[in-house]
Amino acid sequence: MMGKAYWMAGTCCCALCFVNPVHAQSGTTAGDGGQDIIVTATRREQRLQDVPLAVTALSADTLRTRGIENAADLGTGKVPGLAVNSLFGSEVSIALNMRGYGTSDASQGTQDQAVAFYLDGINLPRAQGMSLDLVTPERIEVLRGPQGQLFGRNAEAGAIQIVSKRPSGNLGGDLSAGYGNFNARFVKARVDLPEIAGFRVQLSGIYRQHDGYLDNVRNPLLENVRLYSSPLSSFHFPVANYDRDPGQLNSHGFRIAVERDFGKLNVFYTYDDSWARDDQGFSQFVTSPAAGTIFNPPGGNGPAFISNAAGTFTQAALDRGRYPTSVPFSFLYVPFINKGHGHMLNLALEANDNLTLKSITGIRQSLRYGGADIALSVSTFQPGSTEYLLSKTFSQELQAIYGTDGFNMTLGGIYFHETDKDERDSNLVTNCALPIPGTCDAASGQPTRPWYITSDKFKRQFSRTSAFAVYAQASYTPAILDDRLELTGGLRYSKDSKKARRTVLNGVTLATPQSNEARTDRFDPAFMAKFKLADDVNIYARYARGFRDGGANVRSVIFSAYQPETLDSYEFGLKSQWLVRRVTLNIAAFRNIVNNQQQSLQSNPSVDPSLTDTFNVQSKYKTTGIEVELSARPTPQLSLSVNYTYLHSNLRFVGIDKGTINSFALTNPTFNAQGALIPSAADIAAHPNASFIQLYPLGSPKHSGSIAADYWTPIGDYRLSAHLEWVRSGDMWVASPVRLVTNTTNGVALPNPYYVSPVSSNRVNGRITLGDIKFGGGVKGEIAFWGKNIFNHVDGSHAFGSGNALTPNMPQPMSSIYLQSPRTFGGDLRLTF
């Protein structure tokens, strides 16, 4: 792998990098008012409104105005059909869902995502929030629906493509710095150097940091100590203070881009390197509602708190009406370290006026290690986990793009290789309620050791993926109907192999490693028809199939392979502009059907919440939805935009055979008065000791959307602009379900009272900017003041089932929930030259 990296770097020193840049004109989704945005959603340049599929393009101005600084800021409701949630509250590790579908356990090291994430044509299998921070985006394209015919493996639900700004060859730059509450500060810079011997060079850098969102209780016993990690682990915690405020972030990185033309050959090379330290915050708890429903077990009206027997540590349930400002006891702060770097080489040759040949090569490495408290945040009995995930990828793609009047075709082939090293461990923090020697200070009752170990659960596994594919997509305009009809067909052949091997289980090196393999050998088609009703009014119909690779669950003790899944999508859409392109209205209606769905399931949350199993669901997952994008420019100075998504996904009930985690569909299940699932006597007899679960849809809020307004006015020689938006998302589930019904006896269901809370979002954001400030010497600037979550709404980002003791100190089924950020505000200064 290093040899390939050196080869690329050497090549770039000789002839550096990239195809002719695709220039998106300055505009925003909030109201481009007739300006054409050029996108490459079909691997060739097209006007956004002419692309026969659902695409949203966010320009650089839009990203800055809406405060989108990293992938996590895309947020649920900001883009139709896209749901984004931070895993366990992290700002760096995120999960992407598109049109009600994603990944049920996105933090697994070896499970592929359902939404592909691309940076300048290179697939990032582990989406990193820093990827957006390190580049100056020309635009972000969000493609909804299966994109496998052109964007490759694991784009079954959709794809996100970041297109960076190319080096200009002229001396210029963009420098921003800002400060906000929670001691937030950032500096971001991009400099284009003057062209030298035909080489155009761009340098970028970023530094971003903020303090924690909650005040921790300082504890000298958690300072200047070392957290436990297995002797077999590839990393060990340093001696440090582990009573820091939760919710902190510290990140920095740099990027270099070099471009040169050699006649008709364009060469573009980039290298980026990033580092970030984040944590997973402080988990609150919420209780199951008193009245049970089909989605949750019945709770109660008892006191909502958890505590140890002596009452030394007590935590009340989350108050949804008030954002917490502190934790109720000394909380163990456990950080994660994220490192990543990568090379990209893009060659483009204009063979003639109709044919362009491209080569896109990528080498990347990412590393994430650290730990977290999981389940309920009470120090008296708190599970914790550590993980180490090292991913190395290499990809090589070749493209031939041919176009004439009435006919366009893209041919391509791609090879992708990834190796993963994944280590995981589970342990417990200090438990002062139990007589464990050395864990508590007798006088204060405070913890004296951060973690102790009840049993060694350390696991180490390796995964190797090799994927090869060839694809073709062609569009043809027949000489009928005044050339208003365009027909498109695409086909992709994929041959993938994923091998997994476990060498350590529960702290013991295995004499014979566990191993499994998942293989894929398949064809996936796509068909589209577009008809132009008028110059600015198009309708289209689309069918596409996508798939996601199988693999092995690194969290599972069973370590059995799960198989690939497929998604069939049927879509009808309208793309239109009215009133001299002052009003844009796009509508898409779709139905997705997932077969052989990969589903993760918490194995035993009360013993070890980090353990999950993954299996293929035998019943189909179906989602029907409508997406609406409306933007208008009533006056040259005012832009308005609305987007709305409606999703309806089916609730399924399946059984899991004991020991094998093979699933089966239930026949004629019923429900009791509290909504608990009761399997039929026939299912119980046919599957003794099976577990029965209900699978709710993940990343599928029934309603989501946003309303935004942008206004500007001149003030002397300056330009004053304002942006205000309301982003709303209804309830959605984001974590693996638990077994809600177990141990059926004589046809009677005994509910297992676990509760998994949904999360939602309700945020108002704003920004006021004074621009066109001239500093002389060609330097211009702007000063902005901004606020996010202005009304300090309490919104969740991640939640999972964690408590069902039903004791006097824990009287109700409970769920752990990590919160989105509270109200943040600040100002920044931007200089351009």
For each predicted feature, which ranges?
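N-terminal Sec signal peptide and the immediately downstream disordered periplasmic leader
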Residues: 1-77, 349, 831
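Outer-membrane beta-barrel domain signature, strongest for Gram-negative TonB-dependent receptors
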Residues: 237-244, 249-410, 416-419, 584-585
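Short acidic/polar hinge/loop motifs at secondary-structure boundaries
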Residues: 84, 107, 114-146
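C-terminal beta-signal and adjacent terminal beta-strands/loops
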Residues: 637, 649, 716-719, 727-744, ...
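Transmembrane beta-barrel wall of Gram-negative outer-membrane proteins
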Residues: 172, 179-287, 339-345, 392, ...
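N-terminal periplasmic accessory domains that precede
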Residues: 36, 72, 95-97, 118, ...
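Gram-negative outer-membrane beta-barrel transporters
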Residues: 408-410, 480-481, 487, 616-737
